[in-house]
């Protein structure tokens, strides 16, 4: 945590006042509008208290399934600067517009370690590209885990599915492009839906069979061919709400919505599966089971389906959110119900409805609150869907001090209970957890805290598996510097102290840039101010209760309490308080003490629970008892005066208890009017009452104490403190928030504490615990709390409120405890609850009936040696107006704290809905305070006077002198106080009116609900009674009347009915016969006609034919099949068998006859051919012998002729080949020799020239050299590859022929074809000038060289720039003359092209 020196004092002070509910009216916005909004510096991270695990005692008024929201008045603006360490946990969000600045340690380049509250388990290694994915890369259920990857060989998209229990894996393939989104129907569902970039939908059912994952394709819908790939596609399942009667259900909703770029589609999967059995199916072939919604101008980004599937909400990049009424089964088009721009038209990226999907209360409507996000969720807004008003705005911004300020790109997800919103930044290695509170009745919802958890890599996508309550070990609660201090206390209390606090466990599966990881986060949430019952869990699990003896709690015992530990508060040091926190003099500098100063050990927890308390406790134990009145811890740290800041035993109090007693509230309203006025002038109210420095205060003598203060001191002594253990060492109270009359539940017995005890939220305090002696010991402890008391404006307002002249007015003023207890007795007269003891009555009876000498001596010593202002001093940092805090919430907080300890005497309990209206402080607390004050003035004055007479002080003159001096000061300040009182009362009228109206409305609503319940119960009881009476009456009547009635009715029927019936039926029978005959004739004719028409009708005949065909088809088919199988087939088989036998016999006989005839014919044919073959064979034998003789003769002749011819041809060929070889060799040798001789000549010539140059006194000009020698030398340079030297030597000779010799020898492509150009810029300029001097001869060669040389000029060279203009002008002139001389020359085109090039080069250089 950063140093406190960087905190702006005014801003930090204002924030602390807001946390402690100071300068904040309960119902009005007048004071809120007057107070300037101040930013909250992020260096105060960790001051808000986490919410422990609520065990619940049955008194909670919150509805199940909804996190109740305390009535918090949010500021206008707040800035939270995250620190990047484990102290950035549960940072309070206290404003309507909040800016959250990312920490520098969360950047990717940071070397900071990950959070200790995060446990990471690798699942799979894979490299994902770091970018913002609009869809989900991962889907999580209780049984399976699915994430999108790409194949290593071909890059095709796939989905890997892993079993959470067995780690078995499988792959799902068949996608087009990448996987745009994937999601399970719900956590207990095995149905996985995937959507690829082409818009194809896949729905699988996964199952684990014999240790292997089996996937079954349920739905596969393909988009048309050529659909463009788009990553703006999302899958939205209809939310699954489990029924209360079922524990777990794996059935999922059949409705799913698909968001495409320009439209949304809602599909009924059951209808699709009933109409199609094979997959895939083209979307064009589906005619029913889906509906298309269009209405956005740009691509859709998010959506949500209502639980009944009839309303679809869509968010788009055009900035609109629209709600559509949809009916899949009907023909109605989607109807837009509502639309609005939540973020002023910026692209939307988030749409979340805050519904509890774990257990939904039937009385709570869906879609009550809505979270929207824009600009990749850099801005989040909370909306009320009833009034469409923005309840809160959260903005995320980068660290302004970072070198690379990358804007956040956040992925958000809300857990099923709608209590925590989890965010990951794609650009940073961090996770944020924001706590969400809702109040359905008031229509309010807000983010109450944010926690930062550093990771090792950025999270690209994540899926929530579990968000649940857990118990944190002691080492998970305390910071690192406190763990060593807590080891001793842990060893003394055993292993039971290891689980020291309630926490939250969040299990995620996160896709990082390098791997897929199982992430578990354990942290302690923020304390919910309206339900403060952390000690109830302690009682339930460890049976930590008190007996009848009162325990004395020391700070050591409190330090070892295992509950409600909070991040370290010792990080904040030396934070001065503003002027309006305590009315101090300018010389008195307030100091902020660390919690270590308030942790002085006095007794261990075991000693506290075992040993009874004594009536005279020490100051440290008393302060510990007062500081342990509630289990909640401090929400902020503020300053205290120098007189009390140095006392480590001074108690403090949590913010839930900052409502003062009515008397002190009214008095305090005179001094602390508003934060703005007191900050401007801290001493403007009571300048006469502000003393000097604390070390210069004059000790008050006995003469300074009036009778009223003596009575007050005695009253304080008779209050017994009830010790309630503090939660943990980190819950040490703030030094300036000193426990007062409204701190300890029974120490002062204020109005709030009495109400909490009397209303019975927990176990009541035993009557034996409150005795006069114990109250006296508590008062002694209160006296010892302030070793250096000081005066304050509260004292003057307390003593001189009525403003009457004389001492009688001051003597008649009731004390703080009298006002509090008298009011409590009045408010609970009509109740049956046990009330707090009347300290005034007990004091009076003690003094008059049975005075105790020891008590009187103690009281005298305290009264005469202690200033009477010690109690009022404890209230100088609290809110002094009853309307400036929510009274009922504080009563509930105290009741929850007191209810955490068991008691042996049960107390009647009032229903949670009725206690607010019966004796509630909301029913005009000012009227009650005024009436109680007026009623108690005379009685208290008389008792005080009696006490004063009974025990007169010893130093009477000094007391009178001191009273006179104080009376003069009080009279001087009383006038100003009364004026301010009038102004304050006028300003408070509207606030009191609002309180009364709200109380009446609440009472009316409660009475209305109670009346409705009573009417319903009455109607139910009336119905039951009526049914019972009906049954009894029917039974009685049936038993009494049945026998008699049956006999009488039978006799009467026999006598009367037959004659009457016969007489009445005779005319009727005649009429019936006539009408029947008439009707029958008519019906007969009409039936004949209709039957004839019907028989002639084509439709009837067709119908009869179809019916007959349908009827006879089956029997006829069966008959034909039976007849064919039994009759036709056997007969056909027999006939075929006989036929094939006959055919076989005939074929065998015919074949035998044919073979016999063929044999005889072949024999005769053979004999005839043999007879004709004999002469032919003899003739052939003669011809063969003749041919053999001729062949031998011919072979000899041919071989001799061929040999002679071959010899002749070889002789001729060898002669010609010899001649050609000789000629070729001569030519080659001649060429080689000539070249060698030329080289030798050139070498000799060069040697001679070098010798001549060395012998001469001056260099010989190259112009006088022999042209042949120069050519030889140039040729040698060209052969050696020195082109630039060869051209330079030819150009230096100033001989155009020599230049042409070089140009002819070297090809232009060889010179200018190699980059860079080997010729220097001066050589190029000289070559251009000399070649252009005469274009009449060898024009083609010159033009080609000129064109190449001009193109290779370097215009950036200074030499070229200086001479290029003149040379180019000369060349252009020569080209012009060449064209004029011969316009029709074939080279004119090349010359004109070169002229145009030169014109472009020369023109810019001209002036």
UniProtKB/Swiss-Prot annotation:
Predominant location category: cytoplasm
GO BP terms in the entry: deadenylation-independent decapping of nuclear-transcribed mRNA
Annotated positions of the Phosphothreonine modification: 732, 827, 880, 907
Swiss-Prot/TrEMBL keywords: Acetylation, Coiled coil, Cytoplasm, Nucleus, Phosphoprotein, Repeat, WD repeat
Modified residues (N-acetylalanine): 2
Gene Ontology CC annotations of this record: nucleus; P-body
Disulfide cross-links: none
Start-end of Low complexity biased regions: 609-632, 673-693
Positions of the UniProt region annotated as Disordered: 547-566, 604-632, 673-745, 787-817, 875-951
Chain coiled-coil ranges: 972-1031
Residue positions where N6-acetyllysine is found in the record: 125
WD repeat boundaries on the chain: 174-214, 230-277, 295-334, 342-393
Subcellular location(s) of the protein: Cytoplasm, P-body; Nucleus
Compositional bias segments (type: Polar residues): 727-745
Residues carrying Phosphoserine: 3, 6, 560, 565, 583, 585, 681, 713, 728, 730, 734, 746, 850, 877, 881, 885, 893, 896, 898, 1386
PROSITE patterns, alphabetized: WD_REPEATS_2, WD_REPEATS_REGION
Role: In the process of mRNA degradation, seems to play a role in mRNA decapping. Component of a complex containing DCP2 and DCP1A which functions in decapping of ARE-containing mRNAs. Promotes complex formation between DCP1A and DCP2. Enhances the catalytic activity of DCP2 (in vitro).
Subunit structure: Part of a decapping complex consisting of DCP1A, DCP2, EDC3, EDC4 and probably DDX6. Part of a complex consisting of DCP1A, EDC3, EDC4 and DDX6. Part of a complex consisting of DCP1B, EDC3, EDC4 and DDX6. Interacts with DCP2. Interacts with NBDY. Interacts with Tex19.1. Interacts with LSM14A. Interacts with DDX6.
Membership in a protein family: Belongs to the WD repeat EDC4 family.
Identification of the protein by name: Enhancer of mRNA-decapping protein 4
Lineage, opening ranks: Eukaryota, Metazoa, Chordata, Craniata, Vertebrata
Gene: Edc4
């Amino acid at each position: 945590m950063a140093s406190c020196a960087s905190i702006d004092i005014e801003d930090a002070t204002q924030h602390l006042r807001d946390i402690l509910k100071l300068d904040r009216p309960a119902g009005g916005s007048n004071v809120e509008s007057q107070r300037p909004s101040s930013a909250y510096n992020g260096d105060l991270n960790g001051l808000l208290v986490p919410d422990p695990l609520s065990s619940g005692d049955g008194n909670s008024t919150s509805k199940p399934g909804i996190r109740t929201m305390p009535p918090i008045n949010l500021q206008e603006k707040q800035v939270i600067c995250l620190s990047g360490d484990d102290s950035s946990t549960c940072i309070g969000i206290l404003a309507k517009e909040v800016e959250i600045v990312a920490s520098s340690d969360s950047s990717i380049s940071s070397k900071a370690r990950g959070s200790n509250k995060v446990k990471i388990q690798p699942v799979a290694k894979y490299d994902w590209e770091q970018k913002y994915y609009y869809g989900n890369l991962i889907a999580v259920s209780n049984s399976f885990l699915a994430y999108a990857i790409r194949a290593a060989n071909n890059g095709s998209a796939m989905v890997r599915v892993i079993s959470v229990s067995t780690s078995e894996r499988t792959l799902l393939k068949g996608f087009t492009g990448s996987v745009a989104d994937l999601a399970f129907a719900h956590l207990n569902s095995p149905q996985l839906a995937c959507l690829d970039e082409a818009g194809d939908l896949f729905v699988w059912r996964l199952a684990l069979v014999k240790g292997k994952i089996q996937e079954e394709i349920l739905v596969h819908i393909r988009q048309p061919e050529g659909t463009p790939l788009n990553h703006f596609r999302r899958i939205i399942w209809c939310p699954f709400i489990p029924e209360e009667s079922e524990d777990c259900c794996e059935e999922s909703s059949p409705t799913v919505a698909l968001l495409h770029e320009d439209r949304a589609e809602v599909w009924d999967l059951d209808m699709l599966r009933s109409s199609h059995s094979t997959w895939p199916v083209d979307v064009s072939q589906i005619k029913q089971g889906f509906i298309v919604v269009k209405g956005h101008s740009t691509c859709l980004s998010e959506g949500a389906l209502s639980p009944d599937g009839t309303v679809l909400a869509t968010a788009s990049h055009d900035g609109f959110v629209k709600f559509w009424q949809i009916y899949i089964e009907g023909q109605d088009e989607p109807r837009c119900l509502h639309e609005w721009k939540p973020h002023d038209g910026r692209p939307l990226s988030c749409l979340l409805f805050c519904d509890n999907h774990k257990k939904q209360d039937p009385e709570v409507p869906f879609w009550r609150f809505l979270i929207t996000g824009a600009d990749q969720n850099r801005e989040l807004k909370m909306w009320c869907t009833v009034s469409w008003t923005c309840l809160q705005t959260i903005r995320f911004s980068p660290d302004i001090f970072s070198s690379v300020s990358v804007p956040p790109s956040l992925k958000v997800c809300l857990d099923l209970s709608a209590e925590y919103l989890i965010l990951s930044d794609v650009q940073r290695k961090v996770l944020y957890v924001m706590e969400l509170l809702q109040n359905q009745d008031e229509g309010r919802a807000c983010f109450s805290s944010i926690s930062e958890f550093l990771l090792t890599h950025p999270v690209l996508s994540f899926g929530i598996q579990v968000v649940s309550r857990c118990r944190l070990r002691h080492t998970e609660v305390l910071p690192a510097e406190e763990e060593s201090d807590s080891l001793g206390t842990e060893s003394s209390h055993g292993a039971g102290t290891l689980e020291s606090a309630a926490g939250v466990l969040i299990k995620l599966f996160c896709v990082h840039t390098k791997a897929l990881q199982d992430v578990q986060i354990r942290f302690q949430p923020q304390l919910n101010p309206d339900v403060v019952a952390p000690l109830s869990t302690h009682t339930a699990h460890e049976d930590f209760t008190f007996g009848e003896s009162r325990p004395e709690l020391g700070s050591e015992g409190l330090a070892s309490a295992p509950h409600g530990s909070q991040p370290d508060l010792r990080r904040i040091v030396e934070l001065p308080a503003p002027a309006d926190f305590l009315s101090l003099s300018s010389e008195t500098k307030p100091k902020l003490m660390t919690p270590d100063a308030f942790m002085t050990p006095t007794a261990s927890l075991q000693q506290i629970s075992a040993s009874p308390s004594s009536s005279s406790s020490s100051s440290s134990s008393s302060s510990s008892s007062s500081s342990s009145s509630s289990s909640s811890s401090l929400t902020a740290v503020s300053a205290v005066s120098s007189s009390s800041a140095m006392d480590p035993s001074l108690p403090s109090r949590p913010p839930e208890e900052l409502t003062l007693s009515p008397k002190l509230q009214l008095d305090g309203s005179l001094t602390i009017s508003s934060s703005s006025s007191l900050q401007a002038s801290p001493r403007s109210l009571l300048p006469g009452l502000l003393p000097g420095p604390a070390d210069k205060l004059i000790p008050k003598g006995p003469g300074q104490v009036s009778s009223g203060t003596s009575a007050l001191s005695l009253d304080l002594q008779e209050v017994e403190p009830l010790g309630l253990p503090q939660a943990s060492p980190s819950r040490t109270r703030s030094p300036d928030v000193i426990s007062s009359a409204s701190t300890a539940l029974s120490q002062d017995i204020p109005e709030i504490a009495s109400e909490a005890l009397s209303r019975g939220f927990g176990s009541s305090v035993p009557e034996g615990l409150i005795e006069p002696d114990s109250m006296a010991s508590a008062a002694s402890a209160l006296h010892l709390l302030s070793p250096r008391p000081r005066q304050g404006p509260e004292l003057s307002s307390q003593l001189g409120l009525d403003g009457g002249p004389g001492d009688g007015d001051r003597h008649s003023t009731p004390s703080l405890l009298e006002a509090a207890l008298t009011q409590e007795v009045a408010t609970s007269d009509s109740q049956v609850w046990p009330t707090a003891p009347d300290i005034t009555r007990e004091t009076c009876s003690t003094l008059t009936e049975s005075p105790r000498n020891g008590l009187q001596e103690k009281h005298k010593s305290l009264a005469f040696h202690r200033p009477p202002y010690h109690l009022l001093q404890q209230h100088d940092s609290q809110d002094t107006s009853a309307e400036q805090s929510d009274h009922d919430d504080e009563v509930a907080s105290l009741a929850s704290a007191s209810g955490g300890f068991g008691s042996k005497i049960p107390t009647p309990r009032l229903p949670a809905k009725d206690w607010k209206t019966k004796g509630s402080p909301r029913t005009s607390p000012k009227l009650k305070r005024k009436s109680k004050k007026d009623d108690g003035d005379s009685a208290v004055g008389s008792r005080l006077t009696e006490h004063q007479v009974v025990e007169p002080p010893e130093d009477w003159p000094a007391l009178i002198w001191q009273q006179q001096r104080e009376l003069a000061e009080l009279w001087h300040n009383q006038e100003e106080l009364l004026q301010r009182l009038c102004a304050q009362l006028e300003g408070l009228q509207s606030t009191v009116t609002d309180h009364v109206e709200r109380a009446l409305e609440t009472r009316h609503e409660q009475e209305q609900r109670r009346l409705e319940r009573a009417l319903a119960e009455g109607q139910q009881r009336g119905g039951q009674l009526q049914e019972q009476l009906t049954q009894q009456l029917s039974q009685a009547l049936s038993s009494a009347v049945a026998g008699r009635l049956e006999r009488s009715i039978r006799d009467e029927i026999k006598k009367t009915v037959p004659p009457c019936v016969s007489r009445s039926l005779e005319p009727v029978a005649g009429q019936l016969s006539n009408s029947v005959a008439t009707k029958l004739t008519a019906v007969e004719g009409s039936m004949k006609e209709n039957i004839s028409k019907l028989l002639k009708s084509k439709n009837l005949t067709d119908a009869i034919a179809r019916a007959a065909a349908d009827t006879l088809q089956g029997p006829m088919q069966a008959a034909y099949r039976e007849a064919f199988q039994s009759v036709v087939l056997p007969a056909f088989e027999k006939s075929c068998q006989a036929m094939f036998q006959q055919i076989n016999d005939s074929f065998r006989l015919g074949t035998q006859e044919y073979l016999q005839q063929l044999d005889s014919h072949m024999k005769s044919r053979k004999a005839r051919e043999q007879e004709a073959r004999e002469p032919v064979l003899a003739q052939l034998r003669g011809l063969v012998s003749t041919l053999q003789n001729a062949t031998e003769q011919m072979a000899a002749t041919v071989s001799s002729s061929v040999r002679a011819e071959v010899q002749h041809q070889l002789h001729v060929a060898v002669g010609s080949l010899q001649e050609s070889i000789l000629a070729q060799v001569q030519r080659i040798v001649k060429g080689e020799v000539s070249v060698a001789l030329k080289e030798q000549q050139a070498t000799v010539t060069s040697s001679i020239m070098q010798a001549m140059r060395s012998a001469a006194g001056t260099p010989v000009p190259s112009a006088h050299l022999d042209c042949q020698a120069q050519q030889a030398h140039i040729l040698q340079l060209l052969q050696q590859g020195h082109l630039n030297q060869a051209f330079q030597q030819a150009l230096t000779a100033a001989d155009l022929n020599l230049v042409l010799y070089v140009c002819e020898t070297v090809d232009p492509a060889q010179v200018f074809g190699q980059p860079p150009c080997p010729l220097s810029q001066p050589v190029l300029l000289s070559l251009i000038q000399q070649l252009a001097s005469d274009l009449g001869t060898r024009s083609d060669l010159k033009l080609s060289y000129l064109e190449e040389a001009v193109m290779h000029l370097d215009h950036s060279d200074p030499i070229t720039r200086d001479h290029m203009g003149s040379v180019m002008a000369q060349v252009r002139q020569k080209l012009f003359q060449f064209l004029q001389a011969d316009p029709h020359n074939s080279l004119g085109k090349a010359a004109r092209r070169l002229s145009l090039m030169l014109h472009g080069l020369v023109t810019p250089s001209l002036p």
